[in-house]
């Protein structure tokens, strides 16, 4: 009797171990009860079906990159034109000296103004007389009166109203400032100013031309 009891107990223990092994196969981690999962039920899938890797919500697919719009050509052209206009204003010139003179009447007046306001000593230091002559010629071409100075060196302001062909100029001239308000220039006026201004530039180039061995190229 005692031997049969031992055999029955051993069989029960073996059966219990086998059942436990089948319920928890090797390699399976115990499930945490902190995930809100009821024991005995599988946890819900966290990823879409067919996805085996975590999803990066910040990733951009190649297809989306190809669909990204290119900068508008109109916007690019507008920004380019604004940049060029800023450069022109910074250089004090809004015209092309190589263009036909009849196409740049406003530009010629602006060129004259920039040139007239410059100190001759900073333009052609070694030839101030040439610079003065060029400025005088430009004054005559546009009909501007030359500024007068008193013996004490103080500038004497003049207010003149000059009619020059198809141009009426009202200007307030002082030693450091001239503010003309010209109307439309005739073709002859523009060509004269253009010619004189180009001659003035040629004089400057001749003065500052680089030399090689003491000889101008």
Swiss-Prot record:
Assigned GO CC terms: extracellular region; host cell cytoplasm; host cell nucleus
Compartment(s) of residence: Secreted; Host nucleus; Host cytoplasm
Record region (Disordered): 22-52
Keyword terms: Host cytoplasm, Host nucleus, Secreted, Signal, Virulence
Signal peptide (residue range): 1-23
Motif RxLR-dEER: chain residues: 46-67
Superkingdom as given in the UniProt entry: Eukaryota
Entry note about domains: The RxLR-dEER motif acts to carry the protein into the host cell cytoplasm through binding to cell surface phosphatidylinositol-3-phosphate.
Biological function: Secreted effector that completely suppresses the host cell death induced by cell death-inducing proteins.
Family the UniProt entry places it in: Belongs to the RxLR effector family.
Protein name (Swiss-Prot/TrEMBL): Secreted RxLR effector protein 147
Species name: Plasmopara viticola (Downy mildew of grapevine)
